[in-house]
Amino acid sequence: MGTVVVSAQGEFKALPWSQSTAYNSYLMRDVHRQFASRQSAIQQAFTSPAGMQEYLEGCRERYKQIVGTFPEKENLNVQVVGKIQGTGYYIEKIIFESKPGRYVTAHLYMPENMTVPVPATLELCGHGLNGKGPSSHAAMLMASNGIAVLVVDPIGQGERLQLIDREGKPLTRGATTEHTLLNAGFNLLGTSLAAQEYWDNHRALDYLLTRKDIDPERIGVYGSSGGGTQTAYYIGLDPRVKVAAICSFFSTRERTMELQGPSDGCQHIPYEGREQLEVPDFALMMAPRPLLILSGKYDFVDLWGAQQGFAELQQCYKVLGVPEKVDMLTVETGHGLGAEKRQKLASWFKRWLKDNQSPVKKAAQDRFQLSDMLCTTRGQVNVSMPGALSIMQENVNQLDEWASKREAFLSKGKKTVQAKMLDLLGLKGLPDHKIRIEATGHDSMREYEQYKFQLIREGEMPVPCILIMPSRANADSPIELRLQEEGKGTYLSEYANFAAALTEGKILLLADLRGFGETTDPAFYTDAKYWNREYRNAMVSMHIGRPIMGQRVVDILTLLDFCSEHEFLKGHPVKVFANGIYGPAVIHAAYLDERINSVEITHSVKTWKEYIERPMQWDMYSNVLYGALKYYDLPDLIRLSNCPICFAD
């Protein structure tokens, strides 16, 4: 099938150029522009303490705007379900509810023989499927040096897997896949997996502060890899944290997206780039509190970006008068929290939580069996705890609770709905009708004329299209605008696909919207574990504040402008036929533009609720709009559209 598609696209190529990564390059220009603007702002902030504080507060406010809202705090309903003895410390097995029905499992490493409240820290787990696992070497080291550690299972890890069978066994190959699949539904509801991790971690810290053996004034947070991500997202919004360390995550988003592309779903909050929030900004919000960066020279997390980001941290802390409160260790290793990094971590936390710079006491390397360390009876909260809600159930409940709010919003009229829709699509308004039509080819066939064009709109990707004008066309002939996710060439390569249309005198217009057909991103740039053929471009688009669906809506409007302007097409009714990923973009375009007379869709998502109920689906991010389900679902647009929209399957 792949060979057929490639040859078909070559034969039916309309663009006068060929560059397989053109679409990603186009998107990355916005990433670079946003980063450059942010660089200008931070350099100005470095000129004075007041300017620095103003910059940090601005970052914090913009972060709050995009992270979404959090629920009211309710009873944690803490259960201490067991205790395991270690060498110089003990481990309590803990379960609490961060919100009703959401159970969080954790291990609390407590130093032995302490007579006064001890300092404590959260350890936020990396992406290992076992989460907190049977043990944590870093937590053992901390506890052996008089610092309590609460190691928290994130959503989708440890005893908190969501995509499981009836026995509690995982249905995906790892935590990064589960995180990515769950995040799509969260995004539609106006939140993210990162924000939900933040909430669970915030409630974990709330729990620590209920304990009389913990000193509430001496609290820290650290994490490695995915735990480093959680730490970065956490420390800027919780002033209770007095010291922190980020391991094997810290770099710059610009470098990461350019070198390896977007990471999994828990490592992105939509619109970060649009709001000019770089990874170092989340760390900078910790200032002037002590912060440690831990990196490896051979980590896949880019070291050059880490060094550039750390230089900004140094400048910030220097301007604020506390240069000693930020540090970075780079070791001759790769990814993760290895022994040398753990030693530095413990030393840093001892210094700032205990005012103690004596050598770090070596910890015994105790080994525990995973089965002995489980907090739940069956190894997973969702099959063990009465009343437990899966993330899917939580999100469906939220969606149903908002039903009346959506109806109230939709009743405000088309002008209000359209304004919000454009905002969600990342459009500042409907584009004007100024396009440039460039003819790129013409072939005469026995039954029709074939014309090739690229349609150019300032600031947008060109739209390649092929116009089939049958010899039987007349003034009343409809235009069939066909959008095929497999590419226009695949459709046109089989004469049988359009023979009947020629006989009936229908005008055919086939186009590749950006990211499909002629501008398809090479498959090797997207890891299959993300379950999305255009994951990198979809995530970059969300990062810069231009969801990929919104860009494709613009492409459809460009095609409608072409139909309104070209001498062969003026005055002919436009009927749109779309399949697959194109479906939701066409639904939005039909609501926005009355030049579409009818729509027929096949093999496409019919309601976003499908993504929330059954997140094990391909290509969700191609059709995610951040927070859209607060306002409408796809069936609402179909119901309110001025033209008939139907699904043919």
Feature map (PLM): residue ranges:
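Alpha/beta-hydrolase-fold serine-hydrolase catalytic core, especially in secreted/extracellular enzymes
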Residues: 6-103, 287, 291-464, 468-480, ...
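Catalytic-domain carbohydrate-binding cleft regions of carbohydrate-active enzymes
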Residues: 222-225, 231-235, 240, 246-254, ...
